[in-house]
Amino acid sequence: PLHDINPLRLEWIVQQAGGSLSGLNVVDVGCGGGILTEALAKAGSATTLGVDLADKSLQVARLHALESGAPAKYEKIAVEDLAARQPGHFDVVVCMEMLEHVPDPASAIRACADLAKPGGTVLLSTLNRNPKSYLFAIVGAEYVLKLLPRGTHSFDKFIRPAELARMARQAGLDLQGFMGLTYNPVTQQYRLNPNDVGVNYMASFRKPQ
């Protein structure tokens, strides 16, 4: 599914960053195998750093970057540690599909806010917590359609948009808007949908100047 939603995410990220990543410093927090990181690097950002704590994922990411020639750098470091080392360094901070897997999402959001420059953009994505998301993201994706390995998600870790907005506000960020990502099992296609944040959704925040 990541390969399918990547172009949609990238389009939205570039849009939120003002229409271009050219000359911007970008960090991809919880980058995994670097699918999005690499796309961000190829989209013209000045520097693109992917950070994660999973050795295996970073190995895949580095290898792929070597093969593709994408100017992305990768590092094994916790987002909180990176924020302590490079506060206010990044124009765009991206954290996709990570918050529902960490023990303390509020801490991760605070660190993302700290990484952003004043006036910078912080873009987060996660899964809504409601009966529909349980049906689609767990029963559908993990058991019926087998898009993901069983046990990938814990429903109680899903985050409602209002909860995400509250944590971001407490971290000093201003909400710019939400964007849903919907999946059609018949056409097997994802699309951006601002009117449906029922399952997968992204949120855009600005750090005040």
What are these regions (language model features)?
Residues H3-L24, A39:
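Conserved alpha-helix/loop element of class I SAM-dependent methyltransferases that forms part
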Residues G33-G44:
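Conserved SAM-binding loop of SAM-dependent methyltransferases across substrates and taxa
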Residues A54-K56:
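Conserved SAM/SAH-binding beta-strand->alpha-helix loop
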Residues A83-V92:
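A short acidic, Gly/Pro-enriched loop at the edge of an enzyme's catalytic core
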Residues A106-P118:
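A short glycine-rich, Lys/Arg-flanked "PGG" loop and its adjoining helix->strand segment in the class I
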Residues L123-L145:
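Conserved class I S-adenosyl-L-methionine
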Residues K146-E163:
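Acceptor-substrate binding/catalytic loop of class I
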